């Protein structure tokens, strides 16, 4: 859905996912919505290894906490950017609040997600993500928390990254 929104806003968009079924569903959804964009079955690392056309923007939403080597994904995303390009990661903080909201409430109490979707030890503290970014020559531009209201089914931004959060990082230019 994010890929479709970016394409509707005028972006030339390539959406990737490692799963064939997810790519098939996304392709059909975009076609039915009349949105023009490309989808490929690939991981960030696979795309990086075969891509010769750097991106202005890479988004990696709600993935890092589900992969065995999140630093590898951060590095691949950094290497997909041209100088001055930005990457936005969305993930979950390893905190008590995140555990209560994501695992206890969303998975066990409200049933918004299947039980076992998340593992607390795979959540990523903002400082860890920032360190991985710096290790791949990215600089942190912004970080903001994201919260969810189950009664209205709406997401909203909050100042502190207590549970879900987004971090925007940039690849420096020659002038930086």
Mark where each language-model region is:
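Conserved class I S-adenosyl-L-methionine
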Residues: 86-110
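Conserved SAM-binding strand-loop segment of SAM-dependent methyltransferases
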Residues: 32-47
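Conserved SAM-binding loop of SAM-dependent methyltransferases across substrates and taxa
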Residues: 1-10
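Acceptor-substrate binding/catalytic loop of class I
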Residues: 91, 108-128
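Short alpha-helix
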Residues: 120-143
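Conserved SAM/SAH-binding beta-strand->alpha-helix loop
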Residues: 19-21
């Amino acid at each position: 859905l994010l890929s479709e929104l970016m394409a509707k806003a005028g972006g030339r968009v390539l959406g990737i996912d490692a799963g064939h079924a997810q790519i098939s569903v996304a392709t059909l959804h975009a076609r039915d919505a009349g949105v023009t964009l490309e989808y490929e079955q690939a991981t960030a690392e696979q795309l990086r290894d075969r891509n010769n056309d750097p991106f202005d923007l890479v988004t990696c939403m709600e993935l890092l906490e589900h992969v065995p080597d999140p630093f590898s994904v951060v590095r691949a995303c950094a290497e997909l950017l041209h100088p001055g390009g930005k990457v936005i990661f969305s993930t979950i903080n390893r905190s008590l609040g995140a555990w209560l909201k994501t695992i206890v409430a969303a998975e066990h109490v409200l049933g918004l997600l299947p039980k076992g979707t998340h593992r607390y030890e795979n959540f990523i503290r903002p400082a860890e993500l920032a360190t991985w970014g710096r290790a791949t020559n990215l600089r942190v531009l912004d970080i903001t928390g994201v919260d969810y209201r189950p009664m209205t089914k709406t997401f909203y931004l909050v100042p502190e990254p207590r549970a879900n959060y987004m971090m925007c990082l940039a690849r420096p230019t020659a002038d930086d």
